[in-house]
Amino acid sequence: MKSRFTSTLKGTIVCALLGAFTPGVGRAAERTGMWDLAALDKTSKVQWDERNGLVQEIYYAGEPLRGKPTRVFAYLARPAAGPAAPARKYPAMVLVHGGGGQAFKAWAELWAKRGYVAIAMDLSGNGPGKVRDAGGGPPLNNENVFFHADSDEAMRDGWTYHAVAAVIRAHSVLASLPEVDADRIGVTGISWGGYLTCIVAGLDHRLKVAVPVYGCGYLQEDSYWTKDFVDQMTPAQKERWVRLCDPSSYLAHVQCPILFINGANDPRFFLDSHRRSYETVPPGLGHLAILIGLKHGHNFAI
């Protein structure tokens, strides 16, 4: 089963990035949520740090938090070591971790060895080794995900706002590189990273493929967090959270192929919500793989 999963994931991504699917068209202006997408499409200031073999440490700008600037740490990996751009351009992948995760160097390196330029960022305000960065954004925890706010503006202090912006900006960093084919960039995320992948796929129509693993939408209806978090909101807070932060509000606007992958008995993202997420995607773009025995975890090497 391990090899079957690998074949499904790699095959879908390769086909999409090689142009086997219809490419996305212009952005649907009617669904931008909390984000200034035009600003996120632009390359932010990047600090290029140590490079070791295929992998380089970088920092790029995040969204302001309570009036103060933030930055995002990431590993960027290239298929070939050295500063010179290759004669041909590479496809690229944005790699989005989940709860308890970090910027996984090995994940970026894995995709570089497959022939991609890849970026794996930290979405919990940390630097290398999960050490808290003084300029980092909000940490990933249940309280910051299910952020209780009494206005749309206040929701910008929550984790989802900052994490989605960081993922879209990571795409922009990749697209700015001379060795990257900006028309062949995809995104994949695991668990909460899959949740983010669903949102980003509905917002960032530059993407050519999206692969959320475990993560999905309709968390307000049936998920590990429904009773203890979503149902504790006031009706107004719940409406606001669903409208701005649940993937169900964005999946209908996906314009690239999207492959949903989950285990048959996932303990966090339940299959009924997973199925509804798949069904919300426009016809012809959604693909679904439910795997017996797939355990929940950061299984990026499978």
Give the positions of each predicted feature.
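Cap/lid segment of the alpha/beta-hydrolase catalytic domain
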Residues: 103-105, 109-165, 216-231
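Catalytic cores of secreted or luminal carbohydrate-active enzymes
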Residues: 265-267, 271-302
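N-terminal cap/lid segment of alpha/beta-hydrolase-fold proteins
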Residues: 37-88
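Short beta-strand element of the alpha/beta-hydrolase
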Residues: 87-98
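Short beta-strand/loop motif that positions the catalytic acidic residue
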Residues: 254, 260-262
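Bacterial N-terminal signal peptides
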Residues: 10-22
